[in-house]
From Swiss-Prot:
Membrane-topology annotation of the record: Single-pass membrane protein
Stated name of the protein: Cytochrome c1, heme protein, mitochondrial
Mitochondrial matrix side, ranges: 259-275
GO cellular component, one term: respiratory chain complex III
Entry EC no(s): 7.1.1.8
Spans within the Mitochondrial intermembrane topological domain: 29-239
Catalytic class of the enzyme: translocase
Required cofactor(s): heme c
Main localisation: mitochondrion
Cytochrome c domain mapped to chain residues: 60-212
Assembly description: Component of the ubiquinol-cytochrome c oxidoreductase (cytochrome b-c1 complex, complex III, CIII), a multisubunit enzyme composed of 3 respiratory subunits cytochrome b, cytochrome c1 and Rieske protein, 2 core protein subunits, and additional low-molecular weight protein subunits. The complex exists as an obligatory dimer and forms supercomplexes (SCs) in the inner mitochondrial membrane with cytochrome c oxidase (complex IV, CIV).
Organism: Dictyostelium discoideum
Length: 275
């Protein structure tokens, strides 16, 4: 009945055809735009130990990664959500953190007279920002705004694989690819042209524990540190999950026996009818 009315109404059919054409064209444009923008290499999936359900973060790697961030990455990138006290008993002792924070200068205030003043850093302070505002950051980086690294691992689909591949993936552009001044070729960056110069090189950071300071090792350590920074509760969450699973498994056996005991009478009963 509906199909007959639809065929009889020519105007309705023409409108439906126009709408279908517009939707199809929009879908094709969106698809082609997505394909054109996806001109970068997908990062390799690496076997990070902390990804396994029973594994925690490598806390020695977190300490080394924080050292790489402090000496290399902090010159351009902020870490707004991590204070020094967050690293206590994770990568440093409280005494080490107090000394580390005291080496920084923090703008505080206002005082009783309404003026801002400088003071030594405390463990409750967050890591200092490299630039006072976003305009200063853009001016110092050829118009590019260095992202905050607190949640950069969560903000990328490949997570720590992306950060590691990006840091170690700088190379010469292939034939036919033009890179203007102030940009560098990196096949793992969307668009393949990035304003950040290669940040790491072999031997750039001297580790306190004597670990090999190759570029790949530093990239691995700072990726682990940033992964922890994006999810500091990772280890506690896994510990709680293991406790819950252990408790449930212990309770499950007596509950199963109790269920069999209570339902055995109902499941095995027989009803007979007398004539």
């Amino acid at each position: 009945m509906f199909s007959q009315k639809l065929l009889a109404n020519g105007k309705l059919l023409s409108k439906l055809a126009i709408v279908s054409g517009v939707v199809g064209t929009a879908t094709a444009i969106t698809t082609s735009t997505t394909l054109l923008s996806d001109d970068f290499v997908q990062p390799t999936s690496y076997p990070w130990e902390h990804r396994f359900p029973w594994q925690s973060y490598d806390h020695a790697a977190i300490r080394r990664g924080h050292q790489v961030y402090t000496q290399v990455c902090s010159t351009c990138h902020s870490l707004n959500l991590i204070s020094y006290r967050h690293l206590a008993n994770v990568a440093y002792t409280p005494e080490e953190l107090k000394a580390m924070a005291a080496d920084t200068t923090v703008m505080d205030g206002p005082d009783s007279e309404g003026d801002m003043f400088e003071r030594k850093g405390q463990v409750t302070d967050f890591h200092p920002k490299p630039y006072p505002n976003s305009n200063a950051a853009r001016f110092a980086n050829n118009g590019a705004l260095p992202p905050d690294l607190s949640l950069v691992i969560k903000a990328r689909g490949a997570h720590e694989d992306y950060v590691f591949s990006l840091l170690t993936g700088y190379c010469e552009p292939p034939a036919g690819v033009r890179v203007v001044g102030g940009q560098y070729f990196n096949p793992y960056f969307p668009g393949t042209k990035i304003a950040m110069a290669p940040p790491l090189a072999d031997g750039m950071v001297e580790y306190d524990d004597g670990t090999d300071n190759s570029m790949s090792q530093m990239a691995k350590d700072v990726s682990t540190f940033l992964c922890w920074a994006s999810e500091p509760e990772h280890d506690d969450r896994k510990k709680l999950g293991m406790k819950v699973l252990l408790g449930v498994s212990i309770i499950a056996l007596p509950l199963f026996y109790w269920k069999r005991l209570k339902w055995s009478v109902i499941k095995t009963r027989k009803i007979s009818f007398k004539d």
